[in-house]
């Protein structure tokens, strides 16, 4: 069944037109959607021209897409080397025989660059991106701080930091910004990366707050990063969380 779908995809003109119309309709309304605008700005802040919104098909390309073009794209895609992951009780040899005889695996396939690491935007100074919107009832503020190259040996420390800073309502950010000072309805912050050699590590944060509290919320958020309060009573709980996470991931 999978082979037939790959080699002879049953593409339906009516269904495709319906999907294109749905996508075009979504694009038309997202320009006035505050959450979508905030997401697009965050993407541009982190990736610049590599943003998913900048890389997508233009409206014209979307409208003029046809089945023959889409079929050609599918046929081109299966010419590249593929990785197949199997989880189950069958022995390796059995799975290998089934897949090699059932899937359209081609000889001399094109080399793949997967997984592709998206280049992140670099900054030489503090930069603020701003979208004025009179219809926005709340301020959505994103933070992005590049932290250099990914290092596997720092994963545990980064996880501990994330629990300390953003571990639910007991996390430093939510506790200080929302619980103690009532400056936001939600807030978070964490060190993250794609987890691949050659990828970048960065701090990603967010505050959602009332418009009249935005400036004070940003000041408090940045003070937590530059002058981080110490909560030694939380360390044992964080260690316990990390141990349980390590056991569950085995």
What are these regions (language model features)?
Residues 1-113, 181, 186-250:
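Charge-rich, well-structured scaffold segments of protease-associated domains
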Residues 111-172:
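His/Glu-based metal-binding/catalytic segments typifying zinc-dependent metallopeptidases
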